[in-house]
Amino acid sequence: MEKRTNYPQLTEKQNHFFKLIVDTYIKTGASVASKELVKRCNLKCSSATIRNVMASLEQIGFLEKYHISSGRVPSTLGLEYYAKFLVYNPKKYFDQKLEDLLAKRRIKIDATLEEAAAIVSEVAGVTVVATSNNAAETMKSIQLTTLSELSAIVVIVTSSGRVESKIFNFENSDISLEDLRVAIRLFKERLVDTPLIHLANKARALTPIFGQQLKNYELILQKFIKNIFVFEEETTNKTFNKGAIVLSRNISREEIANVLDLIEKHSVWESIDNDLDEDNNIKLDVSRPNLSIISKKIDFSNEKNIKEITVIGPNNLDYGESFEALEMLEKIIKEKK
């Protein structure tokens, strides 16, 4: 999807009626006819007036004629414009109190991200994806616990609360328990708060220091580099209410497979080219058949290493509610960082 910077200039009248048309489409999921709009919105104008406005909106590419009825549906371009200029309002959504947003959905102020995402996805009928990346995850502590005269366990606790452990056996080994204690002490002094993915390289840089205090320093360092400090950068997606996509009758099986591959294996944020709001790190994709994707980048450190949160739903999803949900989830992440 190409990043769009210029949109047709709409008059105040066109903006007003276009918003009503898309609002109605979102509520009904069906094409919108002029007579229906007059009746549903209690408009004080004729259906002929609405038809003329619809025709002008169709001419500039904001509406499309539905092939089995006289009504019209918003186009991809129209949905982009609606989301960016008629619904998305940072001041309205971003200035609301977190307590009000949580209370609205009966979520406690101390709710975890998982609890909030699960409830929001269920209530709104959308799929929520929380994407984490361990690039900034650090080692907070490294401990040695003796199991017996012939074995011990090395335990690493990370900044996200993750615990990694590895058993060392000393039988038929040139490494003694005392050597291991010295190594752990040096790692505590030199490697705490080091990103996990940099531990191996940082450990190699300690070779001169280890050489001054240990006889078998090369063997010890190699053991840690190959068996303990084996962390690679990983991006992980946690999905809530995946059934909203899988069970949808409006999305083709092929498109479902494509979206599932996206949310299970890739960064949703990086897959979208269209910035809805660069200042607030929000992207929008309505280019997929019967699908809308709104993704928000998380640019602050947090204990879960969350880097982006995404809402996925049909093209007639409630965009205003989706923006509000993303902002609420971002604030919960901030509360927990």
Curated annotation (Swiss-Prot):
UniProt keyword Transcription present: yes
Role this protein plays: Negative regulator of class I heat shock genes (grpE-dnaK-dnaJ and groELS operons). Prevents heat-shock induction of these operons.
UniProt keyword annotations, A-Z: Repressor, Stress response, Transcription, Transcription regulation
Entries under Gene3D superfamilies matching the protein: 3.30.450.40, Heat-inducible transcription repressor hrca homolog, domain 3, Winged helix-like DNA-binding domain superfamily/Winged helix DNA-binding domain
Gene for this chain: hrcA
A Pfam family this chain is assigned to: HrcA
Gene Ontology BP terms: negative regulation of DNA-templated transcription
Highest taxon, organism lineage: Bacteria
Protein family: Belongs to the HrcA family.
InterPro entries noted in UniProt: GAF-like_dom_sf, HrcA, HrcA_C, WH-like_DNA-bd_sf, WH_DNA-bd_sf, WHTH_transcript_rep_HrcA_IDD
Species whose genome carries this gene: Metamycoplasma arthritidis (strain 158L3-1) (Mycoplasma arthritidis)
Protein name: Heat-inducible transcription repressor HrcA
Keyword Transmembrane: no
Gene Ontology MF, one: DNA binding
